[in-house]
Amino acid sequence: MSRVSQARNLGKYFLLIDNMLVVLGFFVVFPLISIRFVDQMGWAAVMVGIALGLRQFIQQGLGIFGGAIADRFGAKPMIVTGMLMRAAGFATMGIAHEPWLLWFSCFLSGLGGTLFDPPRSALVVKLIRPEQRDRFFSLLMMQDSAGAVIGALLGSWLLQYDFRLVCATGAILFILCALFNAWLLPAWKLSTVRTPVREGMRRVMSDKRFVTYVLTLAGYYMLAVQVMLMLPIMVNDIAGSPAAVKWMYAIEACLSLTLLYPIARWSEKRFRLEHRLMAGLLVMSLSMLPIGMVGNLQQLFTLICAFYIGSVIAEPARETLSASLADARARGSYMGFSRLGLAIGGAIGYIGGGWLFDMGKALAQPELPWMMLGIIGFITFLALGWQFSHKRTPRRMLEPGA
């Protein structure tokens, strides 16, 4: 086995272990934020939505800067610093008793993510061969789902005692992850050339096809982020207990572990990436529409099931398509900018979703936020269809089996 092949194989295992620690650290804390501050402390959902939206916007909106800096100086220092910063954000969240302190803790957490997320994504593109990326992204998603359940279970159990224990556990996991990267991650360059920060950003901004694709995905993310805000609140409201939230993530884990990899393997040889992305988005949009009209957990979990199936179809295709469109001379910058759609869509989804949820309750129209999200999903579906039909991505990147 050549040294390059050996490095790729070792890199895969490193990426999987690193990803599991990050997912556990994140899901121990974030699914419980809305329950802690809305249900237990009585804050308005929009206050928590602002905090979650701020974290999302800071982490993803500034990702191009984190990616460009990583292109210049390498992945390791950015990843280690970012993970320590997120740990500090979680520690601060544990003592948050006013909205401004929660917002500040989410700002720190988001800034940490800005530093570590783009270089971690770029490492996947660097280490995984193009023909293997779709399946590897599917493996990461399966791991994300399992980690989400374990993290949510652990966080729900700790929440019975003290929210500070929840935040401390998340902080410790990110400190461990920082030490893991500091110890084992080689000082790899992310791009084929050591691109200056401005040059990497300029290269991305001049790629109109990529920019249009990323911005169009904002609507997709408005739906996707509700697994962290409105869906946990809805489950808690109907069940009457925050313990029921863990079953929502258990559904995701079961579907991902049983369906994600087989669907990716089967569809990669039969359907183009953009068709898989659009099909998943359509299923997600249809499942959102009736959620506000359900009256029991069985109906709600059935719709959540459909939503997750749509995500299982769409997510590997979206990740693979974003990676395929990245210029090898500025991988960090491209993967950083690819998060801008999540920044915009996530911020609007959290803040707008929280506001619509409060408004729906005030007007006695609980279906209002869900109907709006479904409509946004359909508009995004049409926008993606127009983009793919008028601005064709090179066939070698999109065709089945590519």
Swiss-Prot record:
Keyword RNA-binding found: no
GO CC annotation terms, alphabetical: plasma membrane
UniProt keyword terms in alphabetical order: Cell inner membrane, Cell membrane, Membrane, Transmembrane, Transmembrane helix, Transport
GO molecular function, one term: transmembrane transporter activity
Family, as annotated: Belongs to the major facilitator superfamily. DHA1 family. MdtH (TC 2.A.1.2.21) subfamily.
Cross-referenced Gene3D superfamilies: MFS general substrate transporter like domains
Presence of the UniProt keyword Transmembrane helix in the record: yes
Organism (species): Salmonella typhimurium (strain LT2 / SGSC1412 / ATCC 700720)
Cytoplasmic side: 1-12, 117-138, 186-213, 265-276, 321-339, 389-402
PROSITE patterns, alphabetized: MFS
Topological relation to the membrane, as annotated: Multi-pass membrane protein
InterPro entries given in the database record: MFS (IPR011701), MFS_dom (IPR020846), MFS_trans_sf (IPR036259), MFS_Transporters (IPR050171), Multidrug-R_MdtH (IPR022855)
Periplasmic compartment spans: 34-98, 160-164, 235-243, 298-299, 361-367
The protein's name in its UniProt record: Multidrug resistance protein MdtH
CDD domains from the UniProt entry: MFS_MdtH_MDR_like
Membrane-traversing stretches: 13-33, 99-116, 139-159, 165-185, 214-234, 244-264, 277-297, 300-320, 340-360, 368-388
Subcellular location: Cell inner membrane
Main localisation: membrane
